[in-house]
Amino acid sequence: MLEATDLSKVYDGGPPALDCLNLTIEPGEIFCLLGANGAGKTTTINLFLNFIEPSGGTAKVKGLDVTQAPLETKKYLAYIPEQVMLYRNLTGLENLEYFSALAGRRYERSDLLPFFEQVGLTTEEAHKRISTYSKGMRQKVGIAIALAKKAEALLLDEPTSGLDPKASNEFSGLLRQLSSEGVAVFMATHDLFRAKETGTRVGIMNHGRLVDTMDTEGLQHTDLERIYLELIYATRISPRRI
């Protein structure tokens, strides 16, 4: 679904922000990309979204190069940044109606309400202005937009940053629901616990390079923490009992 081949990005002659990334994310997979600030996570997402042009290599969506078929590839994608961009003076329902139409999906308002139900928002909440929503509720509207758009891949940049544990757990559950329906999920995060609990596979990025990937099934959080620290900070930490 999402494929990077020798994907690279250099800004203004500096060191590579992304250095020869090779990665494939399959339908139904939740891939969590871990790394410190400046590691290249957001650059990777921006390249798949065609927000920026690569310095080398290719980013493909469903086999299509995003730079060669930007309109075609965008219709398959939904994007949720750390702060979901919604119109504060419109209701949740009005926002969903607007962004669905923008993506070429037109619905009767009554047909949009089931999307709110799917993400755990009530009809009453759907009719409230976004200015009254918590961050967790706004993130849920972002998921509802992806559902209404019928996106086949969802890209997220630090989506649980600032959420309380309950809201984070609910959000992770929604991502797992999407993956069970065949949506490819690519989440950039620095939260090891959330990556382990949410992802089917995690990758570790450092200074623009993908230095390791691993399946999360059977992986203990303490093992992931140790591997991450060894790769990022070259800190040797002995395995601990849980």
Identify the role of each PLM range:
Residues M1-A4, S8-C20, P70:
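A short, flexible loop at the N-terminus of ABC-type nucleotide-binding domains that lies
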Residues P165-A167:
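Helix N-cap at the start of a conserved alpha-helix in ABC-type nucleotide-binding domains
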Residues E97, R109-E125:
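Conserved ABC ATPase "signature" region
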Residues G57-Q68, E72-T73, D212:
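Conserved ABC transporter NBD signature motif
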Residues L154-D157:
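Catalytic Walker B motif of ABC-type/P-loop ATPase nucleotide-binding domains
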